[in-house]
UniProtKB/Swiss-Prot annotation:
Name used for this protein in its record: Shikimate dehydrogenase (NADP(+))
GO cellular component: cytosol
Its EC number(s): 1.1.1.25
Pathway: Metabolic intermediate biosynthesis; chorismate biosynthesis; chorismate from D-erythrose 4-phosphate and phosphoenolpyruvate: step 4/7
Function as written in the Swiss-Prot or TrEMBL entry: Involved in the biosynthesis of the chorismate, which leads to the biosynthesis of aromatic amino acids. Catalyzes the reversible NADPH linked reduction of 3-dehydroshikimate (DHSA) to yield shikimate (SA).
Catalytic residues in the record: K70 (proton acceptor)
Length: 290
């Protein structure tokens, strides 16, 4: 008798572009697991509670959660992991026989490709571009694993930003990077690591050809690590400019794979077959760029 198929899925809004089904279904197939991963587009925030209630009733095995619902699901779950509590955001849900537990694998996923550089980051300043949910995971990872001397957050309008109120984090305006003599420019130039946590440079967006760091600014240089969370295309305008300047570059695909592997482990207690998944993802991203 065949075991029933376990259903996993991605909760989000207008997320048909996601590579998560490819990642997880490739892993399930490689390990011959009776599991399937699909997409659940939820059009309105108030419907998320109904979706989770239905998941309990139907016995859906687990979920990934993406924008704009990473914080929406928090009060709707039965418990949270320590990582999810620390930033009050969930990107992975495990259904334990009707008990929904929220986790956050973005923190570990973000940290994974930076770990080989940990010693060179400790005690030095870092910069994060963007103030959305992705930046929260980066901040928590830096604080708990890398101990930089200072974290500077570059945002569109620091005066109106209400989410990032921690006095230990320096806040600057992204627009000031266009002024060569500004404090913002100096802070970015001095940063050991620069993280792009904005969607600028993503394939298909109006700003796909742009970098969040102005190309003419000469702020990127040898000795820096430039990490772009954007995973499609592999070589974003920011990474191309950073490589030209002699910096070490980390593409967003590394975070995508690492956080996906952590979620897979939570759901199955197994390690994701990374070589097969990476190959499938590279083929898909390469095809989408043609």
């Amino acid at each position: 008798m065949r075991p029933a198929t376990k259903i996993y899925g991605l909760i989000g809004r207008a997320v048909d572009y996601s590579y998560s089904p490819l990642i997880h279904n490739t892993a399930f197939e490689q390990l011959s697991l009776p599991c399937r991963y699909t997409i659940f587009n939820i059009t309105e925030e108030h419907l998320v509670a109904d979706a989770l209630k239905g998941a309990r009733a139907l016995g859906l095995a687990g979920f990934s959660v993406t924008i704009p619902y990473k914080k929406t699901v928090v009060p709707l779950l039965d418990s949270l992991s320590e990582e999810a509590k620390s930033i009050q955001a969930v990107n992975t849900i495990v259904n334990h026989e009707g008990t929904l537990v929220g986790h956050n694998t973005d923190i570990a996923g973000f940290a994974s490709p930076l770990l080989p550089h940990a010693r060179s980051i400790q005690g030095r300043p870092v910069a994060i571009l963007g103030s959305g949910g992705a930046s929260l995971a980066a901040i928590e990872a830096f604080r708990t694993l890398f101990m930089p001397s200072e974290i500077t957050l570059f945002m569109r309008n620091p005066a109106k930003e209400t989410r990032m109120t921690d006095p230990a984090i320096k806040r600057c305006a992204l627009g000031d990077l266009r002024e060569s003599g500004s404090e913002s420019s100096a802070l970015l130039r001095d940063a050991a690591v620069v993280i792009n946590a904005t969607p600028v440079g993503t394939l298909g967006r109006p700003d796909a050809h742009m970098s969040p760091v102005p190309a003419e600014s000469n702020l990127l240089h040898q000795g820096q690590i430039i990490y772009d969370m954007v995973y499609n295309p592999l070589d974003t305008p920011l990474l191309l400019a950073a490589r030209k300047a002699g910096a070490v570059t980390i593409p967003g695909m590394e975070m995508l794979l690492a956080q996906g592997a952590a979620a897979f482990r939570l759901w199955t207690n197994l390690e994701m077959p990374m070589d097969a998944v990476r190959s499938a993802l590279l083929n898909e991203i390469g095809a989408s760029a043609i």
